[in-house]
């Protein structure tokens, strides 16, 4: 093993050098730490580990007869609000006759102790291997030639050929040793992918819990990353992120209301249910590459089909009518509401709830004025006026349960 200094006399993971380096001392040192890195439970209250093979870590410096020892449970905690909180236990390996349980013989029963032995080991003998002084020696990386612990445990992967070049690299090396490895290790269990998925799911859950806490810097980054990867942050307008709305070309979706409200507009959430995923866009589109003076232009043509019997078919049609080439328009039900009068004001003739007396209408004069106004209208204006006058669809859209798919968004 190679010498080097590491901060603290603890069993915290540290970078490890080759197993084939200088042999560890034959007697105990001033420290009382395990020679090996720990295995860590994935959950709280996990039962003691079981091993596919002998459970003794690989170490070519140890004689076969001394390949026996015990795994000892170490409770762990992390600081939190209201005091420290428990985290899943760590288990450290010690050779028989060394470590915190040095007074026990192999096989003696004690809580938090699991005895292991390799084939051909003399379990009646006691090891002269001693324990590790963290100030002088690094941890061995764990390797199990005949099978490691069961799927309830994991350990941080440390490459065998990683060395230390002094104290200045200790922190970065330790951080790297604690990071998930993309490489496999001999004895690593096949369910490590499940562990990765579980950790990824926890990260997503944590992000969802903190989803409303988007900092100003994060929002700015969301709005100004590469154009094809942008998303609209809260309180941003559509044109702040994707530019002005247009007609008949790219950027033609969104009316004035949607442009102003951004993701607060419920129609955005509804339509995102029809937008293809990245994989669907790449593999389900007609992709057309074209070299231009400013670079490579990629065009993706994708069609989403909403069946006619879809419960929200009419709502999707309505949104498309409103938002495709919708710049300069607003939904018909997006009319300014009259301000409510304060109930604390005394009733007067001006604000009395009693209906005002209506004057008789002068039918002939009004009709004449209407006829003159109609003559000044274009055909498009007449059509718009007709929609405004006779538009009687409900102002509140009931999306129902089928507005979004069960697994969408």
Swiss-Prot record:
<feature type="region of interest" description="Disordered">
    <location>
        <begin position="121"/>
        <end position="194"/>
    </location>
</feature>
<keyword id="KW-0687">Ribonucleoprotein</keyword>
<keyword id="KW-0694">RNA-binding</keyword>
<comment type="subunit">
    <text>Homooligomer. Both monomeric and oligomeric forms interact with RNA. Interacts with protein M. Interacts with NSP3; this interaction serves to tether the genome to the newly translated replicase-transcriptase complex at a very early stage of infection.</text>
</comment>
<feature type="disulfide bond">
    <location>
        <begin position="281"/>
        <end position="308"/>
    </location>
</feature>
<dbReference type="GO" id="GO:0044177">
    <property type="term" value="C:host cell Golgi apparatus"/>
</dbReference>
<feature type="region of interest" description="Dimerization">
    <location>
        <begin position="226"/>
        <end position="333"/>
    </location>
</feature>
<dbReference type="InterPro" id="IPR044345">
    <property type="entry name" value="N_prot_N_CoV"/>
</dbReference>
<feature type="compositionally biased region" description="Low complexity">
    <location>
        <begin position="15"/>
        <end position="31"/>
    </location>
</feature>
<feature type="region of interest" description="RNA-binding">
    <location>
        <begin position="29"/>
        <end position="160"/>
    </location>
</feature>
<dbReference type="InterPro" id="IPR044344">
    <property type="entry name" value="N_prot_C_CoV"/>
</dbReference>
<feature type="domain" description="CoV N NTD">
    <location>
        <begin position="31"/>
        <end position="156"/>
    </location>
</feature>
<dbReference type="GO" id="GO:0019013">
    <property type="term" value="C:viral nucleocapsid"/>
</dbReference>
<feature type="modified residue" description="Phosphoserine; by host">
    <location>
        <position position="379"/>
    </location>
</feature>
<keyword id="KW-1040">Host Golgi apparatus</keyword>
<feature type="disulfide bond">
    <location>
        <begin position="320"/>
        <end position="323"/>
    </location>
</feature>
<feature type="region of interest" description="Disordered">
    <location>
        <begin position="327"/>
        <end position="396"/>
    </location>
</feature>
<dbReference type="GO" id="GO:0044172">
    <property type="term" value="C:host cell endoplasmic reticulum-Golgi intermediate compartment"/>
</dbReference>
<keyword id="KW-0805">Transcription regulation</keyword>
<keyword id="KW-0013">ADP-ribosylation</keyword>
<keyword id="KW-0946">Virion</keyword>
<feature type="modified residue" description="Phosphoserine; by host">
    <location>
        <position position="190"/>
    </location>
</feature>
<comment type="similarity">
    <text>Belongs to the gammacoronavirus nucleocapsid protein family.</text>
</comment>
<dbReference type="InterPro" id="IPR042547">
    <property type="entry name" value="NCAP_gCoV"/>
</dbReference>
<feature type="modified residue" description="Phosphoserine; by host">
    <location>
        <position position="192"/>
    </location>
</feature>
<keyword id="KW-1015">Disulfide bond</keyword>
<dbReference type="Pfam" id="PF00937">
    <property type="entry name" value="CoV_nucleocap"/>
</dbReference>
<protein>
    <recommendedName>
        <fullName>Nucleoprotein</fullName>
    </recommendedName>
</protein>
<feature type="compositionally biased region" description="Basic and acidic residues">
    <location>
        <begin position="368"/>
        <end position="384"/>
    </location>
</feature>
<comment type="function">
    <text>Packages the positive strand viral genome RNA into a helical ribonucleocapsid (RNP) and plays a fundamental role during virion assembly through its interactions with the viral genome and membrane protein M. Plays an important role in enhancing the efficiency of subgenomic viral RNA transcription as well as viral replication.</text>
</comment>
<feature type="compositionally biased region" description="Basic residues">
    <location>
        <begin position="358"/>
        <end position="367"/>
    </location>
</feature>
<dbReference type="InterPro" id="IPR001218">
    <property type="entry name" value="Nucleocap_CoV"/>
</dbReference>
<feature type="modified residue" description="Phosphothreonine; by host">
    <location>
        <position position="378"/>
    </location>
</feature>
<feature type="compositionally biased region" description="Basic residues">
    <location>
        <begin position="70"/>
        <end position="84"/>
    </location>
</feature>
<dbReference type="GO" id="GO:1990904">
    <property type="term" value="C:ribonucleoprotein complex"/>
</dbReference>
<feature type="compositionally biased region" description="Basic and acidic residues">
    <location>
        <begin position="180"/>
        <end position="192"/>
    </location>
</feature>
<keyword id="KW-0543">Viral nucleoprotein</keyword>
<dbReference type="GO" id="GO:0003723">
    <property type="term" value="F:RNA binding"/>
</dbReference>
<dbReference type="InterPro" id="IPR037195">
    <property type="entry name" value="Nucleocapsid_N"/>
</dbReference>
<dbReference type="GO" id="GO:0042802">
    <property type="term" value="F:identical protein binding"/>
</dbReference>
<feature type="compositionally biased region" description="Low complexity">
    <location>
        <begin position="162"/>
        <end position="179"/>
    </location>
</feature>
<keyword id="KW-0597">Phosphoprotein</keyword>
């Amino acid at each position: 093993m190679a010498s080097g200094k590491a901060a603290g006399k603890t069993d915290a993971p540290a970078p490890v050098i080759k197993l084939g380096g200088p042999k560890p001392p034959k007697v105990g040192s001033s420290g009382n730490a395990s020679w090996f890195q720990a295995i860590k439970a994935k959950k709280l209250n996990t039962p003691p580990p079981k091993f596919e093979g002998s459970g003794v870590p690989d170490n070519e410096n140890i004689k076969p007869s001394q390949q026996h020892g015990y795994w000892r449970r170490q409770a762990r905690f992390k600081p939190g609000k209201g005091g420290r909180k428990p985290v899943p236990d760590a288990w450290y390996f010690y050779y028989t006759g060394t470590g915190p349980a040095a007074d026990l013989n192999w096989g003696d029963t004690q809580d938090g102790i699991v005895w292991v032995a390799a084939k051909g080991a003399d379990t009646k003998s006691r090891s002269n291997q001693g324990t590790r002084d963290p100030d002088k020696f690094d941890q061995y990386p764990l390797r199990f030639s005949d099978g490691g612990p069961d799927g309830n445990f994991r350990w941080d992967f440390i490459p065998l050929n990683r060395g230390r070049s002094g104290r200045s690299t200790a922190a970065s090396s330790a951080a790297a040793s604690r990071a998930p490895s993309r490489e496999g290790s001999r004895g690593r269990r096949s369910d490590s992918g499940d562990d990765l998925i579980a950790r990824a799911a926890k990260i997503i859950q944590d992000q969802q819990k903190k989803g409303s806490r988007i900092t100003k810097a994060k929002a700015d980054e969301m709005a100004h990353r590469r154009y094809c990867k942008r998303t609209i942050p809260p309180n941003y307008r559509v044109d702040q992120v994707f530019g002005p709305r247009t007609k008949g070309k790219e950027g033609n979706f969104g009316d004035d209301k949607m442009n102003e409200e951004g993701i607060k507009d419920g129609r955005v959430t509804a339509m995102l249910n029809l937008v293809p995923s990245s994989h669907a866009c790449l593999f389900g589109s007609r992709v057309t590459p074209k070299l231009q003076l400013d670079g490579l232009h990629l065009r993706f043509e994708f069609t989403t089909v909403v069946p006619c019997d879809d419960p929200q078919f009419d709502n999707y049609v309505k949104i498309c009518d409103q938002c495709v080439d919708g710049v300069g328009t607003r939904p018909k039900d997006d009319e300014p509401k009259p301000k409510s009068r304060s109930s604390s004001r005394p009733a007067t003739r001006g604000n009395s709830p009693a209906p005002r007396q209506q004057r008789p209408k002068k039918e002939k004069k009004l009709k004449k004025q209407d006829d003159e106004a109609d003559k000044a209208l274009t055909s498009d204006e007449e059509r718009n006026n007709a929609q405004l006058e006779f538009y009687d669809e409900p102002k509140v859209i009931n999306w129902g349960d089928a507005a979004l798919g069960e697994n969408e968004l």
